[in-house]
Design a protein with these regions (language model features):
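N-terminal glycine-/serine-/threonine-rich phosphate-binding loop
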Residues: 1-77
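Anionic-ligand-binding alpha/beta catalytic cores of soluble enzymes and soluble regulatory domains
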Residues: 107, 121-202
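A conserved acidic, glycine/proline-rich C-terminal tail/linker
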Residues: 189-257
């Protein structure tokens, strides 16, 4: 396992220096650690968005250490944790942020609380655990200076917080799902799988009736983001294998005025 790589994701943005400070802490512990930035533009405090992003990214980033911080409960009694998997070690807050990524690589094996005082940076405030706790533990482990058993007490996996992807509700007549994720282009990924569409006898090229919240429309099932019905909504199976609503040369989210959790009925 390539332990000298830390992949880092957060909702910090790039304006106030938080990302640079965290990476600086890592470099001070071991300047040879490579930090791979996944994203720092996760919407603020959006654990759902962050967990979905990590679930997708974990399949393609190098094995080693994942440092992920979307932490609206920072400074409260929520635990700072490390989870071991076949992929490597995932470090972050115990708020459900990490569990989809863990499940994607075969599930959690062990979990530890980050409580070793020797690896916690002394601090006056209690609002920057990425700098004071997560980064030192991630760097210590990646460098080989800190063993997992030295992190702190082992935790019961069943006690860890979970975020679960909502399941579709399928009846004889309908597939009831929702919008999971909206990307930068306004494409709206749903929790509806291609198998669920084909089980209803839909196929590529079909025009499918859809209801989004209170809007009724039709969308053509396309193989790519090119829809010959210019200005029309299409359905494509996106790069993550889910049915996604798109607008050719446009922004489906703005046209439909939908959002995360918008109800989608086919």
């Amino acid at each position: 396992m390539a332990k000298k790589i830390i992949s880092f994701a957060s909702d910090f943005g790039l304006q106030d220096g938080s990302v640079g400070v965290v990476k600086g802490v890592i470099s001070r512990i071991d300047k040879d650690i490579l930090v791979n930035d996944i994203s720092h533009q996760i919407p603020p405090q959006d654990i759902k968005y962050g967990s979905l992003l990590l679930m997708r990214a974990i399949q393609y980033i190098p094995q080693g250490v994942l440092l992920a911080v979307v932490d609206p409960g920072v400074g409260t009694d929520r635990k700072a944790i490390a989870i071991t998997t076949d992929w490597g070690v995932m470090i972050g807050p115990d708020n459900g942020l990490l569990n989809l990524a863990c499940a994607t690589v075969g599930g959690a094996q062990k979990a530890y609380a980050l409580e070793n005082e020797n690896w916690i940076i002394p601090h006056e405030g209690n609002t920057f655990h990425a700098r004071d706790i997560f980064a030192p533990f991630a760097a210590g482990y990646a460098s080989g200076e800190l063993k997992l058993e030295e992190f702190g007490p082992e935790l019961d996996l069943e006690d860890l917080k979970q975020y679960l992807i909502p399941l579709t509700d399928i009846t004889d007549d309908e597939i009831k799902g929702e919008v999971l994720y909206i990307d930068e282009f306004g494409n709206c990924q749903t929790n509806i799988s291609p198998q669920e569409l084909t089980d209803k006898d839909y196929k590529v090229g079909d025009v499918i009736p859809i209801k989004i919240d209170n809007q009724e429309l039709s969308a053509k099932w396309c193989e790519t983001y090119k829809n010959e019905t210019i200005g029309g909504i299409g359905i494509v199976i996106d790069s993550w294998g889910m049915a996604s609503l798109f607008l050719s040369n446009g922004n489906a989210q703005k046209l439909l005025n939908c959002k995360d959790n918008s109800k989608v009925i086919i």
